[in-house]
Amino acid sequence: MLYIINLIFSCLYLSQVKEKNTFYFLIKILPVILLWVVIIGGQYEVGQDYRNYLDFFSHPHYETRFEPLFTSLSNFAYNLGVKGQGQFYIYALINAIFVFAASHKLGIRNWGIFYFLLITVSTFFNNQMNGIRQCTAAVFVYWAFVELYTSKIKGISLMAVAGGFHYSAIVCLAFTYIEKITKLLTKYPKILLIASCLMSLMPADEQLNQNIVELLPDEVLEETHYEVYAEEETATASIELIYKLSKLLLLPLYLLSLVLLKTGTLSDKDQLFFRFGVLSYSLRCALLINHLIGRFSSYFWIPSILPIYYLCENLYNRKKYVELFFVLVYASFIYFIKVFMGTAEYKSSFIYFQ
């Protein structure tokens, strides 16, 4: 129920906010940020890694196996007296602030629609409950994507910060020249979308896991625990189809959104990030060919919502409210099913009610 309250309150609140200055914008949306932190920070036994992180946050100086920035920040918080459950709040606050700051820099205008899609379509919000390191890295990667449009130095620096929270983020350096790569790979967006969705259905889990493990150096396997992941993901491959279908069901909305490329209503920057959103969704689907490499899809969760966002914004501006309603309902119905079923990261379990 708390997830739904957050969704309704935050979307209504954000829909009233307009501010050009990023700092003042963050001040104005403080109630939304605080609610985000209360929910994510107050999780209790949500996700299979909850206990592992709780133990680490309680004794961070005993562990050195995590990435340097993550370990350093956790140790710093510990030395300040923020231990155990308290550190979940820190990472929730970091994620909330920088997601909104990066999105403001991107030029998001309709914050109610954007936040609705961020929660219901990207899956980022609830996945913070489990993949703490990778989700924090994903926030800095998203920010890097936005900065790369105007400053390669800022973008690359943010990629390096992301790598300090999760080593896998370094692969996103491949998008340093985001404009050229996006235009090249999205020249035929409809073909890209359909092909990536078909690719995700290819059954290649076990063999691909083995190939990846063989290619990675022993040091990387030890630091990232990918060898352990490979064994786990192969064992759970039988449940994969349901997860894939929950993503592939969004394909019609992406195909529908392509009409915006012909209307001339998008600015050059919006069109670039619209196309990058198409590419992000395509990669998000294509990486589902294997659950192990599917972990890299987290870096495209947030930008993948942009085509649907631009579509909804266009419908809103044209006062096509009925069409907008049906698009939002279709985009979010999987999310509401997960929330009401209370599965995995959508489990409603918080320390406040224990």
What are these regions (language model features)?
Residues 135, 141-154:
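Membrane-interface transmembrane helices that cradle and orient dolichyl/undecaprenyl
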Residues 90-106:
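Transmembrane-helix motifs of polytopic, lipid-linked glycan transferases
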Residues 16-92, 337-354:
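TM-lumen/periplasm interface segments of multi-pass membrane proteins
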Residues 103-120:
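Transmembrane-helix signature of polytopic, membrane-embedded enzymes
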Residues 190-197, 316-336:
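Signature aromatic-anchored transmembrane alpha helix within multi-pass, membrane-resident enzymes
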